[in-house]
């Protein structure tokens, strides 16, 4: 089953010409989960993958850069005649916030469920769960989130099953689903249970133990990196993280890929990536519209697919939506580059990008 993270916005606190405010779209099979919804998120989605029918929205905390795009998106869903229910999850205080928004989005033709989570609450889904993680940030309540898949059955040994008298074909499938076939039990012919995939999204946070524990052996840790280490004192005062701190947490948690986001407008992104890679080499600094694809562990590591005008055109032709320009189509101090890429001249677009495997 496909699992990916699409980054609709990677800026920190305020948008820039090439970065939108925080929003991460997680796609797992047919499920669509949005984590945070900063101002302009729906337009970022329209410019890229389209305004999808979301299943759920998870808000990390109530600083405006993480939720201000939500009332407009709810209204747009109404104007598009959405009929499917939508659930919004968030920390304590979410009901009060949504009540205040109601004057903006008005009456909706679809059911809107508001669920306040307590620290360490879990939201069960089909084949996985989403867990709230209490993090350290200057907000009344702030969460990160972990998406954790259910364990998967081990591999079937077809030769052993056949020797025990099981006929190849549908009966093999029954064994894999946990059924006993002709007296043969699944545990007789199935290998060890395999772990599912894990994604962790920090939201805004200073380094904290709860996040490190939740991120243990995660396939992808999406961690904020608002500052470089030169601004460590400012990070401490505002309860944000430096790129080095994010990398130290990733190394301690033994994650497979660290993805840096929530980038201050003072940085291009490359300096954050380089600072983190000095501690934890498997690090990427994200740009708007990047996608991380997460295969099952036995099929390899997560890979980063950079957005490009070529990808935008191809997806627009396939989906019938207007093509969107790459968000970093011009040079400047806010335009990050892949490792080793030369800086683009003013007005020069980055070359079309192919999927890049993490180190």
Place the predicted regions along the sequence by residue.
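Conserved beta-strand hairpin/beta-sheet module of binuclear metal-dependent hydrolase folds
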Residues: 1-50, 83-85, 144-147, 154, ...
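General small-molecule cofactor/ligand-binding pocket signal
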Residues: 6, 89, 113-118, 131-133, ...
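Active-site-proximal loop/helix segment associated with metal-binding centers of metalloenzymes
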Residues: 15-17, 126-214, 220-222
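Active-site neighborhood of phospho(di)ester-bond hydrolases with catalytic His/Asp-centered motifs
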Residues: 35-38, 54-62, 91, 200-205, ...
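Active-site metal-binding motif and surrounding structural segment of the metallo-beta-lactamase
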Residues: 39-89, 113-116
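Metal-dependent catalytic neighborhoods of phosphoester/phosphodiester hydrolases
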Residues: 69-77, 101, 268-277
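Active-site neighborhood of divalent metal-dependent phosphoester bond hydrolases
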Residues: 79-116, 266
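Binuclear metal-ion centers of metallo-dependent hydrolases, dominated by the metallo-beta-lactamase
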Residues: 119-120, 208-331, 337, 341, ...
């Amino acid at each position: 089953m496909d699992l990916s993270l699409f980054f609709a916005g990677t800026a920190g606190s305020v948008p820039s010409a090439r970065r939108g405010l925080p929003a991460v779209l997680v796609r797992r099979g047919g499920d669509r989960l949005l984590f945070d919804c900063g101002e302009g998120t729906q337009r970022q989605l329209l410019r890229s993958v389209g305004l999808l029918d979301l299943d759920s929205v998870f808000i990390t905390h109530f600083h405006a850069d993480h939720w201000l795009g939500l009332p407009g998106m709810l209204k747009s869903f109404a104007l598009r005649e959405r009929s499917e229910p939508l659930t919004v999850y968030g920390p304590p205080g979410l009901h009060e916030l949504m009540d205040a928004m109601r004057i903006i989005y008005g009456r909706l033709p679809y059911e809107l469920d508001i669920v306040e989570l307590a620290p360490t609450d879990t939201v069960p889904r089909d084949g996985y769960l989403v867990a709230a993680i209490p993090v350290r940030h200057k907000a009344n309540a702030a969460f990160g989130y972990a998406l954790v898949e259910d364990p998967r059955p081990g591999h079937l040994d077809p030769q052993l099953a056949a020797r025990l008298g099981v006929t190849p074909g549908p009966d093999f499938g029954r064994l894999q689903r946990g059924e006993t076939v002709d007296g043969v039990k699944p545990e007789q012919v199935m290998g060890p249970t395999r772990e599912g995939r894990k994604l962790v999204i920090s939201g805004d946070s200073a380094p904290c133990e709860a996040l490190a524990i939740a991120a243990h052996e995660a396939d992808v840790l999406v961690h904020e990196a608002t500052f470089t280490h030169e601004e460590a004192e400012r990070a401490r005062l505002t309860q944000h993280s430096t790129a080095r701190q994010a990398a130290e947490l990733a190394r301690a948690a033994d994650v497979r890929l660290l993805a840096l986001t929530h980038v201050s407008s003072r940085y291009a992104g490359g300096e954050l990536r380089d600072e983190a890679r000095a501690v934890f080499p498997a690090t990427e600094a994200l740009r708007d519209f990047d996608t991380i694809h997460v295969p099952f562990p036995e099929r390899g590591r997560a890979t980063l697919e950079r957005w490009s005008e070529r990808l935008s055109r191809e997806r627009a032709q396939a989906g019938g939506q207007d093509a969107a320009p790459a968000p970093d189509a011009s040079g400047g101090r806010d335009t990050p580059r892949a490792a080793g890429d030369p800086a683009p001249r003013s007005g020069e677009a980055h070359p079309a990008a192919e999927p890049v495997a993490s180190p």
